[in-house]
Amino acid sequence: MAKENRTVKKVTTIQKTQVSSKHNTVSVTLVKSFHGRLPSHRETIVGLGLKRINHTKKFKDTSEIRGMINKVSYLLKVEN
């Protein structure tokens, strides 16, 4: 059997998200330590990118982010 040489072109699209718009963002601050919490809750905090107490990040207000916030809401302060 003869080998076929196939070339595959990968096409990537980069979606730019603007986090700076006022009405579609959520500001999240870690107010309690996540040490000693459930592993899934720790992973959620790490997934949000929060590293230490009083660390704040802004996110685009999506259902995925809202679900993560709801899971660990007892550790966070959320502002619109």
From Swiss-Prot:
GO cellular component terms attached to this protein's record: cytosolic large ribosomal subunit
Keyword check for Ribosomal protein: yes
SUPFAM superfamilies named in the record: Ribosomal protein L30p/L7e (SSF55129)
This protein's UniProt keywords: Ribonucleoprotein, Ribosomal protein
Gene3D superfamilies associated with the record: Ribosomal protein L30, ferredoxin-like fold domain
One Gene Ontology MF term: structural constituent of ribosome
GO biological process: translation
Pfam families per the UniProt record, alphabetical: Ribosomal_L30 (PF00327)
InterPro entries: Ribo_uL30_ferredoxin-like_sf, Ribosomal_uL30_bac-type, Ribosomal_uL30_ferredoxin-like
PANTHER family for the chain: LARGE RIBOSOMAL SUBUNIT PROTEIN UL30M (PTHR15892:SF2), MITOCHONDRIAL RIBOSOMAL PROTEIN L30 (PTHR15892)
Subunit structure: Part of the 50S ribosomal subunit.
Family indicated by similarity: Belongs to the universal ribosomal protein uL30 family.
Protein name: Large ribosomal subunit protein uL30
Organism: Vesicomyosocius okutanii subsp. Calyptogena okutanii (strain HA)
